[in-house]
């Protein structure tokens, strides 16, 4: 079976693995390491590929079925012997069955398991004859193989091997073939599969000539031939060879299956280690045994294989005496036009040459052919005698022995053509068949046998020695002038340079020819090397050829075609005409010469001259006296005579102009003077220019810049991960995870409450939680909203609430604080006051103790009334006091602790009870730069420098977001922002249109319409709809708007002081009294309280139902004795009529309320109507007409259309989704979203990239830490008129520039 890697056979244990230094499992460390490497290689052998076609399969059942159906593996013994079929197929359905791969239930036979067999077990002393038996047995050692496959129950020693094996079951095939649709789970499987798409099969069978891609496939194929043989001699020899250690190369340790592969590897890769460099190896055609000499090969074939084969032809069953005669006879079957094949060719001692033609149109286009060397008689003769037919009277002693050389391994010499043929068919079977040319008559012959027959019959009477001697006496005359050359190369160079040969020599043309064998070469250097190596001539015979001294020396008559680029040579005009008819049919001028019967020598620039003319020319070239006159320049085409050489050459050029072919463009038939201009012109027809963007790293081409940028980001960029705790940088996600686990993962205990599942870091926090929530609440149902403390009665709770009053007021902004430290901090940060000003900001009241107690009691009672004054029975009580709970992380202030806890849980992921952890986090995030004046810390030096300016003087660093003017303090900026209000002349609420009479009504009304999106205060101005950042700003808005309505703030303050002096409230029922004597003074926990008589009596008679009685009593008293006017009661009644009973939403009219109930709560209305009247349901489509005065409050994000109610906007958005789908693409980064709101939030993030994670409103400059918070703020606080960026092509407007860019690219891009 084909393997990706050739693993070391496990039959040989490492002798270095000793038992002295053993580890835990009894193996030495080195031995254990080598065994693990071997196990990895063994797991890699799980590739299932066919030996014949190299097709890869995922399971062994598939490859078995493939071999039976497609590769004709029908013999049962073949399947059994095949190592790929020794492992059962695994599938996910077999995991519930008993595993067939365990060794307990497998019958190996009696001879298996005994010591001494080739494959020993690494866990016990047993050994086996086959590797498949060993694998089955190893599965029984479950204690040594801890990792198990969940699909087929196969055991593995390593986890990575098990995971790699599981991919074969799960079908995770991420490696795809580029040639076909095949996919594989491993890359090595894909590499093996890719070999099936290659047409090159270098490994060929010597018996049936079938090609294979790998040596292992050839080895498996050879086993089929061995089983078909009747004799087992070669099979036993192959088994003996497999048992030897000579399968490995001694130089590079590469393994081979056959000796011929090893010998071929040594000859090609390690020629210095070859046993004989001068003579190559000869291989027997029957048993593939190698021999260094011809005598040894012939003797081996006569002695070993003569009795078996008897040299009989497989086609006609004719027997021959020698192997040489058999090979010659077999060639005759392939070429029936040759001589009688039954005549055995006699070995004549003549040489032969072969000249190749590289003309594209020529039928004789071959690369090279057999070469011949004229050598002296060999010193070592053959071991047997051969019958040679001697014809003629020439004695054999005068005939020279000719040696033959192979064109593929030029160092080998052969004494006969038959031996050379044996060598070619055994050692160079993959080489193409060559055409052979006779050196005497230049006849082209298809095979060595035909050449041998031709030499024997045609040139048998010629003396080889004489022929060899005449080869050097050939001279050539130029057909266009009288120049004579003794070398063919010199003549061709002369024609190209002197007579303007039109077609330049191409790259593949043979420009230089050997004077001995006429073999062509591309360069002069390669020709000289060929002459030196093949013909054993040290000098340059190309330029040193002997010249004839007498005019009686022969002249070779050759003809060359001028239409071919390399001028092929022919020995007769008939062959030249035949060549022109076959290869140059499209040239009418050449056909005219043929049809007219001319022996056109104009077509042959290599035409010969007479012997006398050649002798005269040679004598002139040697410096002798000229023996011919000047008038002897005769044109061989027309017979014209010229007395000068210049005139003769000019005349010949006229013949060339009529004969030479014209260079025309095949596309437009335009004529050109030379080949270079023709090539440039034709290139224009086939040339097209295109622009590509090439990656500088991997040279990949892309058609657009975006594709190139995406490729660079995906393949050639590195993403780094920075730890925000220690600022260390890592190159991968795994590295930073490991860093966080090692450096910043401190183990801490978490205490969890089992009742509410809250986690606490310390046991003290948990105890405090249990105390306030699970221990005291059993009997105390009244809980303080500020500190969370519980009380048994409502009187105790009301008395406790008075302790949360603020005693220290700021004289600049009227803020109040619980402690003097908070007041001093407020003065430093907000008003830049660093002196001790608290003596002027004392407590409320005079210095006398009596007045102080009276004022304190009145203040406490007033605060209780304000904190418990409700607007509706369904609404919660809202505290109007200043923010007293601040976040230690971001500085946000809230009026109630519950709001602070919600803020910490939502924004900082801090649960209630983690106060200590919050302080630690606040300490961790403190900066390293500390102010020396106020001890405030900063993260950067620039922040500290900017803060120091506040101590040096009033710097105007507060900018108005509307007009851009700067102010020195936040107070002055707040007062300035009020002047930009759009509702200066009215004091009505813009939400419910209720008129506001005083500043208290304004503050109370703002609490009725809270702004939940405002994370700082939770409120907004209900008159001008501006977002307020603090309670001070809200008060300034109330003062400003109430002044415009004619109510002076001075009169209001005087009225409040007068009311405080006259009215006294009960701490329980909040009933007001004119005199202090109407209240009973009580001392609870060291503090004085005032209660009315009825409340004192109710508190004395407190019972389990006391709470209900008190609340009922208080409602009755508040309804009868309250100081609220009748107009307020009527207003509340009207409000209740226009308020939804299900969701408590108020509407301006009853029509709007009914429409709201029918659209939003239509299920409840349908149920009520069905139970009462059982009438058909009212259609939910009833809506207010656009002609009404209702405000447009619903706007589509996509197209910015405004609608009047929620039902219309829902229908409109649904239509958008039906038409456009759920994919909304960002044109800036090509990211898609399923809703326009998410796309808008994403575009907001684009606008603030690189801003440090902060998002600022473009209208009011409010800063947010999340993009969705800014989006909610824009929807609630700003309208269509506040949008900044207008589209130039349509009326749509946008808040951010990125929205405009995305809109332009998606809607208006051409």
From Swiss-Prot:
Pfam families in the cross-refs? zf-C2H2, zf-C2H2_6
Q: Sorted alphabetically, which SUPFAM superfamilies does this protein's record hold? A: beta-beta-alpha zinc fingers
Q: Which GO terms describe its biological process?
A: cell differentiation; regulation of transcription by RNA polymerase II
Region annotated Disordered sits at 1-46, 82-106
- Composition bias of kind Basic residues appears in 1-10
Family membership noted in the UniProt record: Belongs to the krueppel C2H2-type zinc-finger protein family.
User: Under what name is this protein listed?
Assistant: Zinc finger protein 521
Which organism encodes this protein?
Xenopus laevis
């Amino acid at each position: 079976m084909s393997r990706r890697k050739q693993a070391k056979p496990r039959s040989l244990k490492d002798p270095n693995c000793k038992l002295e230094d053993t580890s835990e499992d009894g193996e030495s460390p080195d031995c254990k390491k080598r065994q693990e490497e071997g196990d990895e290689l063994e797991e890699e052998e799980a590739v299932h590929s066919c030996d014949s076609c190299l097709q890869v399969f995922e399971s062994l059942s598939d490859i078995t079925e493939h071999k039976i159906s497609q590769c004709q593996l029908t013999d049962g013994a073949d399947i059994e012997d095949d190592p790929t079929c020794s492992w059962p197929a695994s599938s996910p359905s077999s995991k519930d069955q008993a595993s067939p791969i365990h060794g307990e239930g497998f019958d190996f036979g009696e001879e298996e398991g005994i010591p001494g067999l080739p494959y020993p077990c690494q866990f016990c002393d047993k050994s086996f004859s086959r590797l498949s038996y060993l694998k089955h047995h190893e599965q029984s050692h479950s204690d040594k193989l801890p990792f198990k496959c969940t699909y087929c129950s196969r055991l593995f020693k390593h986890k990575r091997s098990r995971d790699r094996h599981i991919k074969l079951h799960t079908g995770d095939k991420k490696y795809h073939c580029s040639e076909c649709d095949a996919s594989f789970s491993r890359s090595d499987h894909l590499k093996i599969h890719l070999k099936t798409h290659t047409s090159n099969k270098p490994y060929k069978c010597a018996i049936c000539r079938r090609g294979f891609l790998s040596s292992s496939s050839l080895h498996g194929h050879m086993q089929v031939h061995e089983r078909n043989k009747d004799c087992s001699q070669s099979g036993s020899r192959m088994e003996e060879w497999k048992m030897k250690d000579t399968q490995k190369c001694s130089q590079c340790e590469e393994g081979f299956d056959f000796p011929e592969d090893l010998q071929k590897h040594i000859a090609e890769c390690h020629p210095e280690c070859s046993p004989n460099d001068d003579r190559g190896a000869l291989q027997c055609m029957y048993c593939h045994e190698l021999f260094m000499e011809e005598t040894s090969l012939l003797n081996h074939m006569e002695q070993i294989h003569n009795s078996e084969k008897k040299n009989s032809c497989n086609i006609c069953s004719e027997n021959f005496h020698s192997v040489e005669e058999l090979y010659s006879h077999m060639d005759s079957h392939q070429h029936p036009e040759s001589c009688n094949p039954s005549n055995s060719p006699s070995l004549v001692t003549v040489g032969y040459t072969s000249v190749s033609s590289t003309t594209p149109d020529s039928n004789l286009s071959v690369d090279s052919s057999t070469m011949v060397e004229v050598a002296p008689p060999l010193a070592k003769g053959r071991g047997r005698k051969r019958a040679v037919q001697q014809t003629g009277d020439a004695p054999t002693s005068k005939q020279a022995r000719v040696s033959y050389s192979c064109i593929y391994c030029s160092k080998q010499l052969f004494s006969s053509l038959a031996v050379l043929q044996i060598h070619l068919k055994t050692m160079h079977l993959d080489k193409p068949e060559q055409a052979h040319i006779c050196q005497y008559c230049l006849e082209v012959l298809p095979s060595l046998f035909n050449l041998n027959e031709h030499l024997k019959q045609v040139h048998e009477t010629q003396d080889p020695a004489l022929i060899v001697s005449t080869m050097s006496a050939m001279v050539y005359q130029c057909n266009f002038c009288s120049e004579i050359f003794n070398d063919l190369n010199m003549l061709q160079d002369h024609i190209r340079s002197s007579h303007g040969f039109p077609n330049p020599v191409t790259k593949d043309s043979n420009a230089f020819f050997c004077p001995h064998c006429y073999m062509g070469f591309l360069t002069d250097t390669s020709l000289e090397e060929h002459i030196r190596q093949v013909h054993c001539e040290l000098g340059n015979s190309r330029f040193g050829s002997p010249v004839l001294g007498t005019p009686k020396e022969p002249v070779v008559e050759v003809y060359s075609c001028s239409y071919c680029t390399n001028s092929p040579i022919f020995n007769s005009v008939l062959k030249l005409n035949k060549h022109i008819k076959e290869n140059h049919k499209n040239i009418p001028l050449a056909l005219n010469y043929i049809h007219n019967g001319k022996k056109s020598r104009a077509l042959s620039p290599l035409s010969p001259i007479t012997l006398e003319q050649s002798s005269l020319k040679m004598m002139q070239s040697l410096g002798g006296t000229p023996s011919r006159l000047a008038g002897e320049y005769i044109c061989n085409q027309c017979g014209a005579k010229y007395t000068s050489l210049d005139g003769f050459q000019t005349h010949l050029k006229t013949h060339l102009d009529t004969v030479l072919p014209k260079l025309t463009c095949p596309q437009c038939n335009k004529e050109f003077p030379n080949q270079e201009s023709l090539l440039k012109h034709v290139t224009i027809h086939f040339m097209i220019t295109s622009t590509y963007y090439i990656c500088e790293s991997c040279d990949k081409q892309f058609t657009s810049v975006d594709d190139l940028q995406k490729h660079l980001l995906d393949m050639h960029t590195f993403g780094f991960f920075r730890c925000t705790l220690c600022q260390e940088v890592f190159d991968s996600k795994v590295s930073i995870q490991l860093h966080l686990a090692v450096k910043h993962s401190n183990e801490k205990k978490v205490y969890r409450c089992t009742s509410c599942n809250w986690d606490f870091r310390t046991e003290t926090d948990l105890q405090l939680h249990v105390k306030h929530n699970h221990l005291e609440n059993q009997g105390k149902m009244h809980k303080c909203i500020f500190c969370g403390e519980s009380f048994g009665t409502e009187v105790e709770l009301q008395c406790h609430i008075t302790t949360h009053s603020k005693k220290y007021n700021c004289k600049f902004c009227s803020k109040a604080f619980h402690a003097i430290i908070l007041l001093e901090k407020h003065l430093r940060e907000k008003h830049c006051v660093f002196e001790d000003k608290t003596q002027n900001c004392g407590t409320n009241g005079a210095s006398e103790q009596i007045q102080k107690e009276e004022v304190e009691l009145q203040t406490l009672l007033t605060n209780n009334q304000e904190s418990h004054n409700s607007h509706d029975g369904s609404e919660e009580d809202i505290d109007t006091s200043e923010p007293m709970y601040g976040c230690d992380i971001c500085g946000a202030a809230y009026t109630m602790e519950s709001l602070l806890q919600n803020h910490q849980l939502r924004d900082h992921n801090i649960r209630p009870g983690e106060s200590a952890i919050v302080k630690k986090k606040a300490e961790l995030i403190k900066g390293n730069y500390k102010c020396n004046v106020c001890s405030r810390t900063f993260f950067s030096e620039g922040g500290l420098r900017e803060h120091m300016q506040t101590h040096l003087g009033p710097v105007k660093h507060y900018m108005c977001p509307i007009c851009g003017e700067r102010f020195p303090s936040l107070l002055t900026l707040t007062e300035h922002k009020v002047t930009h209000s759009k509702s200066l002349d009215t004091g009505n609420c813009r939400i419910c249109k209720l008129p506001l009479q005083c500043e208290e009504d304004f503050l109370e009304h703002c609490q009725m319409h809270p702004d939940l999106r405002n994370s700082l205060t939770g409120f907004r101005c209900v008159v001008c709809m501006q977002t307020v950042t603090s309670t001070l700003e809200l008060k300034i808005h109330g003062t400003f708007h109430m002044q415009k309505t004619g109510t002076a703030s001075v009169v209001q303050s005087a009225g409040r002081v007068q009311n405080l002096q006259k009215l006294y409230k009960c701490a329980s029922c909040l009933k007001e009294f004119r005199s202090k004597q109407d209240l009973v003074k009580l001392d609870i926990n060291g503090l004085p309280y005032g209660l009315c008589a009825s409340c004192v009596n109710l508190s004395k008679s407190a019972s389990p139902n006391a709470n209900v009685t008190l609340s009922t009593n208080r409602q009755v008293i508040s309804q009868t004795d309250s100081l609220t006017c009748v107009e307020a009661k009527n207003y509340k009644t009207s409000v209740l009529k226009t308020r939804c009973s299900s969701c408590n939403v108020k509407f301006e009219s009853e029509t709007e309320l009914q429409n709201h109930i029918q659209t939003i709560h239509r299920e409840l209305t349908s149920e009520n109507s069905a139970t009462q009247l059982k009438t058909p349901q009212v259609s939910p489509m009833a809506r207010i007409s656009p002609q009404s005065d209702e405000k447009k409050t619903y706007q589509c994000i996509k197209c910015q259309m405004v609608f009047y109610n929620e039902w219309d906007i829902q229908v409109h958005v649904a239509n958008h989704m039906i038409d456009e789908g759920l994919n909304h693409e960002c044109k800036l980064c090509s990211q898609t979203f399923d809703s326009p709101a998410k796309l808008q939030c994403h575009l907001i993030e684009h606008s603030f990239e690189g801003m440090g994670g902060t998002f600022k409103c473009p209208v009011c400059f409010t800063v947010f830490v999340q993009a969705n918070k800014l989006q909610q703020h824009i929807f609630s606080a700003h309208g269509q008129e506040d949008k900044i960026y207008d589209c130039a092509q349509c009326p749509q407007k946008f808040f951010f520039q990125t929205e405009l860019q995305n809109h332009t690219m998606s809607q208006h891009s051409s």
